């Protein structure tokens, strides 16, 4: 019931506190004559409080909702009741407040215009509604832009070639990953090989980060890159590591360079043999041993890649020998191959004689009346591969190849010789390239004689 004051005004005050909400008030008046009138209804809203429903770090990178970001200029979103008309923010107790802006969806937003330093921060948000009520709420957040660059290396035990060359003969090599920060939440290794790539997620074991392929790699080149991500969403990549897997090597060829005589028969008349070894270009060491002696000598790389040479520094004896070659490549792989060869420096000196049947003069005087005399060749070794007879006559020399017949080594001119002097010499060559010459044989062909004159000595008349 309303009451009239001393000034004649009527007023109404509730006897008790009203709860928040909407109220409709209507005034009813009645005079002494019994007339009654009612006012138009008055709707009143009682609003004694407001709230801040949520504060969100918009650029919360990494793990969602952990209020950890790597953005130096954080962005915030504030959710409030619809009747809030002012939202302002303050950082780390600063008395300088900034006003958020309400978007079309009724959410308040603010992007910090300047860089906020690394570390922990406290955001204070104050909201004011249409009734003048205020509410305050804080948000703890952290800015972290720091993450170390990881490093990946081939395990020294698997670096089987020259130390640090990242060439290995191990098909499942191990790799050590270092410089991983404690707040890293994901570590992966990206492996590129032969035009394709894959990513493997790692787990820290025994306080260390390590990677070993789960299956054997084929020979070839591999590029490994470590990717690290922390709780704040920072990402770092290691410098790519190029690794070559090489699990075998070979010896392509062993050549006896001074192979005289028949080519490639590995027979020589040189007491100091020379060898050429052809190998893959990644071979770094070539060594040789003779007849299983266990004494090794190192070959020297030639001007042509993949060719190695060695000339024996002292005489090697006559006969058969076995050369053993061992090679080692950059990955530490080894290969062994042998070459059987023979040294032969001996060859008998041939002898040529005029056949006795054609020695028509005094035996052994080298004088014959035969225009096509035959000659016997002796002292011809079994390993001889070529026999020639050179015939010099009248300032001209001709050479003829001789073949062994059923009757032995015989040389007979193919055409009749004219009368005159002839010098014959035999040359023999064996499989090892040894050459010997006979002593010259001088022969005179005289196929006719004459009676120049008959004289009666005691012709006295």
Residue ranges and their predicted role:
Residues 15-22, 112-120, 213-221, 312-320, ...:
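Surface-exposed, short loops/turns at beta-strand junctions within beta-sandwich domains
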